[in-house]
């Protein structure tokens, strides 16, 4: 047996070095958070629950161009456009998103020329049935109304990178 190995085993050098390593981390602040009660800040580029936005005058932004429907790789978006109005604009009659199919890639948000469809900051939208994850136009507009302040702030922060 080597004298060096014998000295190491008698003096328990590995044990002592491991003990000091553990003690160094023991007295540091904990990196974990108590999730339901504490939350980390969310990035401005976070992609969560979908929402349809409105203009400040209350009119919906969607112009029924169907670019989001065309670009969606999961084919989760279904849009039906209404007839043209007197001023030449169109609006959607039906705007549905199947959140079960959605892969949250953000391509719909990037394709939209008027920032109508966005992925908001909400990530806590668990449901008990699959049918509740089929969002219609009314629910998407309600999400947009509920999260408008946070959505506008994240779009403003992300503007230099678009």
Swiss-Prot record:
Q: What cofactors does the UniProt entry give for this protein?
A: [4Fe-4S] cluster
Q: Which GO molecular-function terms appear in the entry?
A: 4 iron, 4 sulfur cluster binding; iron ion binding; NADH:ubiquinone reductase (non-electrogenic) activity; quinone binding
Q: Which UniProt keywords apply?
A: 4Fe-4S, Cell inner membrane, Cell membrane, Iron, Iron-sulfur, Membrane, Metal-binding, NAD, Quinone, Repeat, Translocase, Ubiquinone
Q: Which residues form the 4Fe-4S ferredoxin-type domain?
A: 52-82, 93-122
Q: Where does [4Fe-4S] cluster 1 bind?
A: 62, 65, 68, 112
Q: What is its main location?
A: membrane
Q: Name one GO cellular component term.
A: plasma membrane
Q: How does it sit in the membrane?
A: Peripheral membrane protein
Q: How is the cofactor bound?
A: Binds 2 [4Fe-4S] clusters per subunit.
- State its location(s): Cell inner membrane
Which processes are annotated in GO (biological process)?
Answer: aerobic respiration
Signal as UniProt keyword? no
- Gene3D superfamilies attached to this UniProt entry: 3.30.70.3270
Superkingdom of origin: Bacteria
Q: Quaternary arrangement and interactors, per the entry?
A: NDH-1 is composed of 14 different subunits. Subunits NuoA, H, J, K, L, M, N constitute the membrane sector of the complex.
Q: Give the PANTHER family listed for this entry.
A: NADH DEHYDROGENASE [UBIQUINONE] IRON-SULFUR PROTEIN 8, MITOCHONDRIAL, NADH DEHYDROGENASE UBIQUINONE IRON-SULFUR PROTEIN 8, MITOCHONDRIAL
- Similarity annotation: Belongs to the complex I 23 kDa subunit family.
Q: Which NCBIfam families match?
A: NuoI (TIGR01971), PRK05888.1-4 (NF004538), PRK05888.1-5 (NF004539)
Any idea what job this protein has? NDH-1 shuttles electrons from NADH, via FMN and iron-sulfur (Fe-S) centers, to quinones in the respiratory chain. The immediate electron acceptor for the enzyme in this species is believed to be ubiquinone. Couples the redox reaction to proton translocation (for every two electrons transferred, four hydrogen ions are translocated across the cytoplasmic membrane), and thus conserves the redox energy in a proton gradient.
**What is the name of the protein in this document?**
NADH-quinone oxidoreductase subunit I 2
